[in-house]
Amino acid sequence: MRIVLVGPPGAGKGTQAAYLAQNLSIPHIATGDLFRANISQGTDLGKQARAYMDAGQLVPDEVTIGMAKDRMAQADAAGGFLLDGFPRNVGQAEALDVMLKDEGVKLDAVLDLEVPEDEVVKRIAGRRVCRNNSAHVFHLTYNPPKAEGVCDACGGELYQRDDDSEETVRTRLEVYHTQTEPIIDYYRAQGLVVTISALGKVADVTARAMEALKASDEG
């Protein structure tokens, strides 16, 4: 299957993408991984991306599209893929359609992970990270430390990252509504959108997604 995964920040896209890709035996292609790989390997696209990032500018669509095209041309993606973080706007979605058409294939589904805005804020703003080890992550509601403000693993101080503040989260949601939500309308017009609730346990959401994808494939 060829799938695009969409959803607001805090919807658990990365987690679900990993499980779904494994269950479907297709590669999980994440924008962040594409950028890191191209930059670390010193590709032409990586150098272009690095120059924009170092200048504090947004990387142009054509660079991101080029990276995605190169990745989808690799052998492991011949039978399908799961895109996470791409396309990010309608222009990228249109470019993806052209790419796939040139290869004589098309998308099978666009999986939309739906989470209420207040839940997104709660999920992200509740995170607390250890100052000694950023891999030690807690949550005030879902995974609270035994002692308030103290890391269970090493006793380090727990703090809220700037990116996790409610103000920042709401700004990110605004960007999502403005830039990424129109993609859902674009694909809905093609009859590709499959919407599921991303509330509940990770395994339950994965099962819900697999069932919805199977139904859309059969339909």
Swiss-Prot record:
It is an enzyme of class 2 (transferase). Transmembrane segments: none annotated. InterPro entries: Adenyl_kin_sub (IPR006259), Adenylat/UMP-CMP_kin (IPR000850), Adenylat_kinase_CS (IPR033690), Adenylate_kinase_lid-dom (IPR007862), P-loop_NTPase (IPR027417). It is found in: Cytoplasm. ATP binds at G10, A11, G12, K13, G14, T15, R127, V137, F138, G200. One of its GO terms (molecular function) is adenylate kinase activity. Residues 30-59 are annotated as: NMP. Pathway: Purine metabolism; AMP biosynthesis via salvage pathway; AMP from ADP: step 1/1. Residues 126-164 are annotated as: LID. Its main location: cytoplasm. Pfam families: ADK (PF00406), ADK_lid (PF05191). GO terms for biological process: AMP salvage. Keywords: ATP-binding, Cytoplasm, Kinase, Nucleotide biosynthesis, Nucleotide-binding, Transferase. GO terms for cellular component: cytoplasm. Gene3D superfamilies: P-loop containing nucleotide triphosphate hydrolases. Monomer. Consists of three domains, a large central CORE domain and two small peripheral domains, NMPbind and LID, which undergo movements during catalysis. The LID domain closes over the site of phosphoryl transfer upon ATP binding. Assembling and dissambling the active center during each catalytic cycle provides an effective means to prevent ATP hydrolysis. Belongs to the adenylate kinase family. Catalyzes the reversible transfer of the terminal phosphate group between ATP and AMP. Plays an important role in cellular energy homeostasis and in adenine nucleotide metabolism. PANTHER family: NUCLEOTIDE KINASE. This is Adenylate kinase.
